[in-house]
């Protein structure tokens, strides 16, 4: 199959390329990038007036399989990704059973091959059962092709255990991803600890819990000369810790979510559970620090932490509702509306954070538009105005902090291995 993407503005951070050109695709691979390309019998995709970027990646997603198909499935989650312009996701291991062995990884690969609409990377657990007591079968999972290791949802408390995990993962050239909240400080907390939580009478999760955990991981990475990736960073001090560590040459990377860049804990005054997430949406000083971290490259990646729940779970008293909400179908619109169109970040920075940088962190041969590479592309309409309607999401999860908001900018098409899997909002 031959596809010719014509006349788009190609924004390609790996090449520092930002120009109008064509992309010729044959048999799932990029054959040529240049001006005035042609090919007999090719399907033409007119990208005039649109941005063509390397396929967007979301390295922090919960597809909820195995074991929680009421919340999400590989099929529904990857349809949501395609609808949102995401060509590849990495799914976290806090499932039932936990993805902590080669056998479970192999079963996941079988389902992914048959059900996924976009590419799916698997993240294996650091510890058996996410208990932080015994290392999971990391070597065997690495051989099965997992992209990274994480006990996401839980902080790896034991320092010596984490040190060993970092050293072991590095033997297989895999990165450790850590959910950084010191558990004794956040136990029972339901929102950011601060003025708003005090006024509402809700037990908070203090910023210092993240600061301590991030500092610990940075020092361990520095001591072991191994990489560590900080999941969903959300505090001012944590951002500064990463900034200074990078200056010292520590192999630390960090991600942030749209919700931590856009909202503050003031939205929690409504007691709406669609804003409840861990780490919590924080105060303005923390939000602004995250934006500054993305601007100067301290924060490498923008991810969703897409965490669907059944509606009955979220539709209950605030303190009882689980944390997490969906994000795959809104991340592009949210980032274009509140970060790009506001002048907070330029388009090259946005594309890098949502594609190229994530490929680099996970060691993937992706995130670049160049001959010989897989033809994974995200096509953006920067000026498309639309209203978020969670009832129409492909995801099973319908709780979204962005519901009913008006966005400017949307994914116009998603191309995976040279095949158009989404066009104008419809997953094909």
Name these PLM-found stretches.
Residues 1-54:
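Histidine-rich, glycine-flanked metal-binding segment
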Residues 8, 23, 28, 49, ...:
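Divalent metal-coordination and catalytic microenvironments
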Residues 48-112:
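Metal-associated gating/positioning segment near the N- to mid-region
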Residues 59-72, 121-134, 203-207:
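Active-site mouth loops of central-metabolism enzymes
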Residues 102-119, 167-178, 330:
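Alpha-helix-loop-beta-strand connector modules within alpha/beta enzyme cores
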Residues 133-302:
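Histidine/acidic residue-rich metal-binding segments in metalloenzymes
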Residues 199-227, 274, 295-296, 300-302, ...:
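His/Asp/Glu-enriched, well-ordered alpha-helical/loop segment
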Residues 317-320, 341, 374-428:
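C-terminal cap of metal-dependent C-N hydrolases
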């Amino acid at each position: 199959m031959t596809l010719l993407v014509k006349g788009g503005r190609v924004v390609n951070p790996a090449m520092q390329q930002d120009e109008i050109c064509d992309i010729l695709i044959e048999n799932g691979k990029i054959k040529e990038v240049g001006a005035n390309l042609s090919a007999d019998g090719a399907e033409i995709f007119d990208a005039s007036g649109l941005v063509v970027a390397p396929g967007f990646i979301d390295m922090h997603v919960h597809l909820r399989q195995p074991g929680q198909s009421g919340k999400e499935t590989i099929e529904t989650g990857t349809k949501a990704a395609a609808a949102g312009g995401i060509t590849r996701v990495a799914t976290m291991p806090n499932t039932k059973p936990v993805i902590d062995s080669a056998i479970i990884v192999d079963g996941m690969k079988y389902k992914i091959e048959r059900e996924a609409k976009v590419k799916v990377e698997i993240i294996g657990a650091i510890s058996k059962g996410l208990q932080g007591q015994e290392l999971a079968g990391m070597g065997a999972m690495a051989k099965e092709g997992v992209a990274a290791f994480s006990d996401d949802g839980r902080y790896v408390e034991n320092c010596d255990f984490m040190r060993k995990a970092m050293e072991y993962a590095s033997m297989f050239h895999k990165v450790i991803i850590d959910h950084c909240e010191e558990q004794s400080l956040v136990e029972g907390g339901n929102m950011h600890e601060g003025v708003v939580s005090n006024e509402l009478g809700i037990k908070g999760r203090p910023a210092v819990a993240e600061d301590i955990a991030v500092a610990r991981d940075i020092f361990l990475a520095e001591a072991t000369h191994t990489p560590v990736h900080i999941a969903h960073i959300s505090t001012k001090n944590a951002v500064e810790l990463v900034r200074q560590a990078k200056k010292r040459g520590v192999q630390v990377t960090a991600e942030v979510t749209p919700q931590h860049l856009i909202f503050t804990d003031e939205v929690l005054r409504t007691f709406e559970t669609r804003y409840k997430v861990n780490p919590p949406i924080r105060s303005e000083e923390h939000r602004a620090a995250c934006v500054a971290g993305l601007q100067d490259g301290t924060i490498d990646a923008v991810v969703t932490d897409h965490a669907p729940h059944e509606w009955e779970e979220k539709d209950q008293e605030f303190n009882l509702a689980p944390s997490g909400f969906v994000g795959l179908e809104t991340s592009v619109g949210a980032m274009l509306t509140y970060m790009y169109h506001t002048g907070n970040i330029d388009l090259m920075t946005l594309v890098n954070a949502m594609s190229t940088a994530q490929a680099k962190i996970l060691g993937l041969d992706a995130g670049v538009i160049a001959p010989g590479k897989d033809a994974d592309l995200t096509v953006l309409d920067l000026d498309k105005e639309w209203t978020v309607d969670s009832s129409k999401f492909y995801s099973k999860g319908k709780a979204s902090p962005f519901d009913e908001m008006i966005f400017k900018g949307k994914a116009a098409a998603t191309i995976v291995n040279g095949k158009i899997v989404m066009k104008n909002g419809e997953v094909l």
